[in-house]
Structure formats: structure tokens, C-alpha cells
């Protein structure tokens, strides 16, 4: 994990070609290609607004340069695997488009991330955060949103596995 926390400015051998392959084959059944989805902020807002009926949906907003984000990613991966029948986790990368094929890909490989990763093309609009949750008042990460039926839990801080477990139980009993 220490290697993942360092600065991700160097280009990994073949990283651009590998990432280009992932993005170009997103329509295939290839699991690696299906892991990455690009979208703009309007699409993100629409997807987050959809009410999950059968599983708790967990959105973890992160970036490759955010040390607290990188530290919590393994906790989220373990949580999602332990609760695969009841939880759907999505990692939402807020990295700039220019580092998707370098820094983001390197973090994904280094931390062995297996859950879906949404790459958000934010442009210059930062007001979209308030549409995700009114509690998102600062442009800070990590941020996590958990939704289930009509219930939501919003966290503007790094989370530990224990906190994820507690939030899951709380949402399921509402």
C-alpha cells in the first residue's frame, strides 16, 4: 500500500495502452474493461438519484492524490466482498481526465481494486457536489454516500470497516 500512497506522476510501462484497451472495450464482457465507466457530472447525479431497491448502494468518492482515500480503499473492498449479496460498491474517481490512464490506473492496479470505478469528467463545474448530497459543503474527499430504498447516509470523512458495518445495519433496519 505504501507504493500506492506515493505520488503517481510517473507513467507505468504500457499504462496508456492498457487503459486505452480498457476504455475501448467497455461494451465487451471483459471484467477488467467493464470495471471502468466514464461519465459527466449530470449522468453521475442521475445515477446516484436512482433509488436502489434490493441492495445497499455505496458510492465512495476518491482521488489518486488523496492519502486518506487510498488508505480506506482496502477497507471498502473487504466490506463489499463480505457483503456481496447485500451491497453494491462503486468507487467514484474525482481525478482529472489527464491522469485517468496514469495515476488512476496505477492506484487500481496497486490496490487490486475489483469494484466498479466511475471516472467523472467534471470540467470546471464544482457545484454538482451539492446535488449528490446537501451535506457536501466543502470540496473535500474522501466522501461516501450509502443509499437504500429512500434512506441515505452521507459521510464527509475517511471511514473504517466498523463504520461501514454500522451504517449498513442502520440502513437495513430503517
Stretches with model-predicted labels:
Residues 61-75:
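Conserved redox-active cysteine motifs that mediate thiol-disulfide chemistry
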Residues 24-25:
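C-terminal motif of bacterial Sec signal peptides marking the signal peptidase cleavage site
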Residues 55, 62-65, 96:
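Short pre-active-site segment immediately N-terminal to redox-active cysteine/selenocysteine motifs
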Residues 36-56:
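A short beta-strand-turn-helix
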Residues 74-111, 125-129:
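Structural microenvironment flanking redox-active thiols in thiol-disulfide oxidoreductases
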Residues 107-141:
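Short, internal strand/loop/helix patches
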Residues 141-174:
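Thiol-/selenol-based redox modules, centered on thioredoxin-like
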Residues 2-15:
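Bacterial N-terminal signal peptides that target proteins for export
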Amino acid at each position: 500500500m505504501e507504493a500506492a500512497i506515493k505520488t503517481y506522476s510517473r507513467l507505468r510501462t504500457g499504462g496508456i495502452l492498457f487503459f486505452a484497451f480498457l476504455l475501448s472495450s467497455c461494451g465487451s464482457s471483459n471484467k477488467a474493461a467493464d470495471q471502468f465507466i466514464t461519465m459527466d457530472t449530470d449522468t453521475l447525479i442521475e445515477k446516484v438519484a436512482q433509488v436502489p431497491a434490493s441492495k445497499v448502494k455505496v458510492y465512495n468518492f476518491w482521488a489518486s492524490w488523496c492519502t486518506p482515500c487510498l488508505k480506506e480503499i482496502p477497507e471498502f473492498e473487504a466490506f463489499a466482498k463480505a457483503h456481496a449479496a447485500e451491497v453494491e460498491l462503486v468507487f467514484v474517481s474525482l481525478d482529472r481526465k489527464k491522469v485517468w490512464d496514469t495515476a488512476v490506473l496505477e492506484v487500481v492496479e496497486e490496490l487490486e481494486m475489483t469494484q466498479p470505478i466511475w471516472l467523472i469528467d467534471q470540467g470546471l463545474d464544482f457545484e454538482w457536489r451539492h446535488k449528490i448530497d446537501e451535506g457536501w459543503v466543502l470540496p473535500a474527499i474522501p466522501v461516501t454516500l450509502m443509499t437504500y430504498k429512500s434512506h441515505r447516509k452521507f459521510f464527509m470523512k475517511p471511514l473504517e470497516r466498523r463504520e461501514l458495518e454500522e451504517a449498513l445495519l442502520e440502513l437495513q433496519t430503517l
